[in-house]
């Protein structure tokens, strides 16, 4: 049985798309621009239901996480105006944090204490 060349090309293209697309989505998700002092980031997890980014860390000492959040992934706005993210450490809302805002992303600095292991950043949309 000889396959039609057009059908063969379509099969190859579909297979290639299936390999490429998951890695593109994983790259967007895994490649947050961040730095951490006093610990290590273990994983990032998006919670679409609660419009939040969950961050698991291993906090070995008092430190801080500086993370750049692309607006295409998570943002906090009321209408067209920026509003503050709600930031939680182990379920307790952080009263203040430093933030730098650009048209494309928002960079926030979250201080943490030793043994804090769970951070969440809640926006208004993802």
Predicted regions and their residues:
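Secretory targeting signatures
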Residues: 1-27, 87, 126
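Short polybasic amphipathic segments
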Residues: 33, 85-87
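Surface-exposed beta-strand/loop patches in extracellular or lumenal glycoproteins
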Residues: 58-83
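Short strand-turn-strand beta-turns centered on an Asx-Gly dipeptide
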Residues: 89-92
């Amino acid at each position: 049985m000889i396959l039609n060349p057009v059908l063969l090309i379509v099969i190859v293209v579909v297979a290639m798309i299936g390999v490429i697309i998951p890695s593109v989505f994983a790259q967007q998700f895994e490649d947050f621009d961040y730095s951490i002092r006093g610990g290590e980031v273990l994983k990032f997890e998006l919670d679409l239901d609660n419009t939040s980014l969950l961050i698991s860390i291993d906090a070995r000492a008092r430190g801080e996480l500086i993370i750049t959040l692309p607006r295409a992934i998570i943002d906090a706005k009321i209408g067209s105006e920026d509003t503050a993210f709600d930031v939680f450490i182990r379920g307790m809302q952080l009263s203040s944090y430093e933030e730098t805002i650009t048209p494309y992303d928002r960079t926030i600095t979250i201080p943490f204490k030793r043994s804090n292991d769970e951070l969440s950043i809640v926006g208004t949309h993802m």
